[in-house]
């Protein structure tokens, strides 16, 4: 089989204006970025508001392996399958970050015959949104240091600045730095940090904003640090929100591309799900809902992370009601949860698959707790045996959960037709009983406990004194009624990435709490989660190259 990039480069891609016309969008309502990419204009978005909403389908997964279990591939493939059975469908995805593209994954635009294109552009710089977010974030950092250098009228305590610089690359050397060295003319020396761009609050704000006015309002609320009187200092107090919003004036507009089978795709925003809220933008999702009858979107990592935040944060703020949730499961991930070491995941082991089903069971239970009907999609890999696949299907049928095979990687939309039919049938027969894990009125501690106990299955949660002090401060500042955003390993229900399956009797430790006042949530950091990843021993970047003719290879 051809590689992902070879498949993408041989695709018959439509001019993006033709894709727009397919959606009923005039050429004058899109802003072209070459022949195959465009942004949807504010005029386009505004004129869609009176249209009825389509059906929102979420794609999530079991706790993944490091390689991922194919959520993006399944999302794209399902939309293509829906189109094949005559439904008007659209994909709504996050934008890939250069960090994992150059680190572990080598790309994040789907795979095989279920990709979004042009995949090289999407995986690399796309329409420049990531760079605009990086610039807006770092402008605020520059304004903070300049304010201190120019006399510090607001009395910012240099030791209590909480705003970090960002870059969209995995670079562990930047986790802890010292800035303004070299003499008095370079500013006030202090410790600082870099986060990856997709962990920036600016990214979260962009993805939760519904207009330019909303964006600017949220940016003004960003808390950058505290003054010597222990009062918060905001971006608004530094008069930074206008310039930041100006840098984001195009980045806030959703991007329109297409799948390999010319199904429309909106790709916009890209917060990580283990250290941020893990969903594409509200603007993109709401726009997609007006453009098609079936909208297929995804949330990062397993249902304990991305889906939980999709439901409790994004749907809460945006007023969204998902109709069904697809839980992507793979034989290899089930083997991992059944105790098989990473180097033996390709070996036949039906009993390990059966042991690992406890992980799938917990994710199914979690989706049901939100009142959303689940469907299990077994994402097929070439090395999977019939016996292993049959064991998963038999288990799902035994517990009464719909299950279908997904062969969209190898066959495109054709490989997901049965899954598409099942999804349409469930949507037509089920009325949504969507609900949240916690109420806005719950305290920040109570919200965290409800997630930890109900979604992760933990015995209890322990708050370090530092975290507890911060929580009490945030509640005193009036932020007690906003959601919590858990920062946790994606590999386990616990905060220990090596505790696979469905662990029991464990305690989650919240070591730090950080306020994201502009985004509107409090981040609870657990375990050893870092907001700046590092590159692996053999980064994917080593395999990426470009020919003298400008043809890229090595992306996947």
Swiss-Prot record:
Pathway: One-carbon metabolism; tetrahydrofolate interconversion. One of its GO terms (biological process) is tetrahydrofolate interconversion. It is an enzyme of class 6 (ligase). Gene3D superfamilies: Domain 2, N(10)-formyltetrahydrofolate synthetase, Formyltetrahydrofolate synthetase, domain 3, P-loop containing nucleotide triphosphate hydrolases. It holds the Pfam family FTHFS. Its EC number is 6.3.4.3. InterPro entries: Formate_THF_ligase (IPR000559), Formate_THF_ligase_CS (IPR020628), P-loop_NTPase (IPR027417). Keywords: ATP-binding, Ligase, Nucleotide-binding, One-carbon metabolism. Signal peptide: none annotated. ATP binds at residues 65-72. NCBIfam families: PRK13505.1. Belongs to the formate--tetrahydrofolate ligase family. HAMAP family: FTHFS. This is Formate--tetrahydrofolate ligase. It comes from Elusimicrobium minutum (strain Pei191). The gene is fhs.
């Amino acid at each position: 089989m051809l590689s992902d990039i070879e498949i993408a480069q041989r695709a018959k891609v439509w001019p993006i204006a033709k894709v727009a016309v397919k959606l009923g969008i005039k050429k004058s309502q899109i802003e072209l970025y070459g022949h195959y990419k465009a942004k949807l204009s504010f005029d386009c978005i505004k004129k869609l508001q009176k249209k009825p909403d389509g059906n929102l389908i979420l794609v999530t997964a079991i706790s993944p392996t490091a390689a991922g279990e194919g959520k993006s591939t399944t999302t794209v493939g399902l939309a293509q399958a829906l189109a094949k059975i005559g439904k008007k469908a659209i994909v709504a995805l996050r934008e890939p970050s250069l960090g994992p593209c150059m680190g572990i994954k080598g790309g994040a635009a789907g795979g095989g015959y279920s990709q979004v294109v042009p995949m090289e552009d999407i995986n690399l710089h796309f329409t420049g949104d990531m760079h605009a977010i990086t610039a807006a974030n770092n402008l605020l950092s520059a304004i903070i240091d300049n304010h201190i250098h120019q006399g510090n009228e607001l009395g910012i305590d240099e030791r209590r600045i909480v705003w970090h610089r960002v870059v969209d690359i995995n670079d562990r050397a930047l986790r802890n730095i010292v800035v303004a060295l070299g003499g008095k003319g370079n500013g006030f020396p202090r410790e600082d940090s870099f986060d990856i761009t997709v962990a920036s609050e600016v990214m979260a704000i962009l993805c939760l904003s519904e207009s330019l006015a909303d964006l600017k309002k949220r940016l003004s609320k960003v808390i950058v640090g505290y003054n010597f009187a222990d009062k918060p200092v905001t971006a608004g107090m530094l008069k930074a929100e206008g310039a930041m919003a100006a840098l984001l004036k195009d980045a806030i507009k959703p991007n329109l591309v297409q799948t390999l089978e010319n199904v429309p795709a909106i790709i916009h925003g890209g917060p990580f799900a283990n250290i941020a809220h893990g969903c594409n933008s509200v603007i993109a999702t709401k726009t997609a809902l007006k453009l098609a009858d079936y909208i297929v979107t995804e949330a990062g990592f397993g249902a304990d992370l991305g889906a939980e935040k999709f439901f409790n944060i994004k749907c809460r703020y945006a007023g969204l009601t998902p109709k069904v949730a697809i839980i992507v499961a793979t034989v290899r991930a089930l083997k991992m949860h059944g105790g098989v070491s990473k180097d033996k995941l390709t070996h036949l082991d039906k009993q390990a698959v059966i042991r690992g089903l406890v992980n799938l069971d917990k994710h199914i239970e979690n989706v049901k707790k939100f009142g959303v009907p689940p469907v299990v999609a077994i994402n097929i890999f070439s090395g999977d045996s019939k016996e292993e696949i049959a064991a998963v299907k038999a288990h799902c049928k035994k517990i009464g959960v719909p299950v279908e095979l997904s062969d969209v990687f190898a066959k495109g939309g054709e490989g997901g037709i049965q899954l598409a039919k099942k999804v349409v049938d469930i949507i037509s027969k089920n009325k949504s009983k969507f609900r949240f894990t916690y109420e806005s009125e719950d305290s920040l501690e109570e919200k965290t406990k409800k997630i930890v106990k109900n979604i992760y299955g933990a015995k209890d949660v322990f708050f370090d004194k530092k975290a507890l002090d911060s929580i009490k401060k945030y509640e005193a500042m009036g932020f007690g009624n906003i959601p919590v955003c858990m920062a946790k390993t994606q590999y386990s229900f616990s905060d220990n990435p090596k505790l696979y399956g469905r662990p029991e009797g464990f305690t989650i430790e919240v070591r730090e709490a950080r306020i994201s006042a502009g985004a509107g949530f409090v981040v609870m950091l657990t375990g050893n989660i870092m907001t700046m990843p590092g590159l692996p021993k053999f980064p994917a970047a080593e395999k990426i190259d470009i020919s003298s003719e400008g043809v890229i290879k090595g992306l996947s």
